[in-house]
Amino acid sequence: MARKSDFKTVETDLDELEEKIRKHRRKIAKRIIIVVAAVVALFLIVWLWMALRTYKSFDVKNSVEQKDKSAVSFVDFCGAVVEYSNDGVLYTDSDGNRIWNQAFEMSSPQVVTCESFMTIYDRGGTDLYIMDKKGVKKEIGTSWPIIKACIASQGTVAVLVSQDENYYVKLYDVNGKELASGEFFGEQKNIPVDIALSYDAKKLAVDMIDVSGGKTDSVISFYNFGSVGQNEIDNNVGTYKYENQLIPEIAYVSDSRMIAVSDQNIMVFDGSQKPKLKQTIKLEKLIDSVFYNNKYIGVAYSNNDKNCTSHIKLYDFNGKMLMENDTAIAYNSIEFDSNNEVCVTGDTACEIYTIHGVKKFYHTFDNKLYKLMYKSGMNNYIFIYDGAMDEVRLK
């Protein structure tokens, strides 16, 4: 009997021990949940504070004296500054130190960048350069005047040239070797006005105006230079026609996504092999300007309100409107910076908006403002204006 009683006691003790262990585990789990919830709440509070915070001034961290830059244009390229004019191009860091430069003579220099490569070409001329962060990779001379050029992420360039009523699209690799060529005859009433090259250089789109029917239609043709396109006539993997619409601009924003901007809509095409129309964003009226990067697209409309010269709307590529704001700045440019913020730049004033519609920063300057660029780090920017280039931190 004693043994049986002892067995019950041991069994009871084990049950009590297991219950104590369960209670202890529950306490630990509750503490972990409380700590995690507190950390998440703190993170959200900090994130909201940062997202909604506005700035009215800045500290100058570094200032570089600049000569007259009235005839110079500026581009943000790989975190440094490209300055270009009719006489050449200069690539400097934020301290004003020269990384490289290239002299040339162009009547209308244009710069296009894609990740770590860029091209500078003379619109209406015959000169084109392929460049990267180290300098010139290749200089290409075309036989006929250049209408448009674009570049892919590995340095491949597509060039639209014209001679009389004939138009040619040529593809060159980073070493200047011709990879492909196509001809479009103006006498057939299809006149190319723009081209777009995917980041991987495997797909090319040609935007044409069709005036054969006595009215203005637009035609976009897609070409694939990979294995899929080799099975199609002239590598053509799709053509879209838009009646009574003028499409002046097309652009690839990734390997597989292209946008087309018409006088009525913005069309978004997707497809790694054969692009298909994914989304159409209806425009309220004629836009003054359009700006985009690989995540978002924005438009600016004229505003009849004397206090607000323009109305800005921002969309994702699914057509969802993310923000809209009015600006009183008579802007020279509206663009995304490398931090996905919207920068509005006027002669002597600028604004920075977040994609959530918060006016993060507004400032007026004593001198003419040429360029506003984001610099890596929290609230770091570069202001380029008449007489100086300043690296600043908002406060």
Enumerate the predicted regions with their spans.
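Aromatic (tryptophan-biased) beta-strands that constitute blades/sheets of beta-rich domains
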Residues: 53-71, 93, 97-106, 136-142, ...
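Structured, soluble extracytoplasmic/luminal domains of envelope-associated proteins
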Residues: 99-154, 278-281, 288-306, 310-314
